[in-house]
């Protein structure tokens, strides 16, 4: 997952991180 985050733009990485966090919380 880290690889994808690093490759993707910063704003995109933030969105993905937020989505992942939401799923984890759920």
Swiss-Prot record:
Main subcellular location of this protein, as a coarse class: membrane
> What function does the entry list?
Coordinates cortex and coat assembly during sporulation. Associates with the spore coat protein SpoIVA and with the outer forespore membrane, thereby serving as a membrane anchor that tethers SpoIVA and the entire spore coat to the forespore surface. May also serve as a competitive inhibitor of FtsH activity during sporulation.
Which InterPro entries does this UniProt record tie to the protein? Spore_V_M
Q: Could you tell me what induces this protein?
A: Expressed during sporulation and is regulated by the mother cell-specific transcription factors sigma E and SpoIIID. There is a lag-phase of approximately 2 hours between the onset of transcription and translation. The 5' untranslated region negatively influences its own translation.
UniProt effect for mutating residue 17 to D: Localizes to the mother cell cytosol
List the residue ranges forming a coiled coil, or say none: none
What is its quaternary makeup? Interacts with SpoIVA. May interact with the ATP-dependent protease FtsH.
Query: What's the encoding gene here?
Result: spoVM
Species annotation: Bacillus subtilis (strain 168)
Q: Where in the cell is it found?
A: Forespore outer membrane
State the name under which the record lists this protein: Stage V sporulation protein M
UniProt GO cellular component terms: membrane
């Amino acid at each position: 997952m880290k690889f994808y985050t690093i490759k993707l733009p910063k704003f995109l990485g933030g969105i993905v991180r937020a989505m992942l966090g939401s799923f984890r919380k759920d």
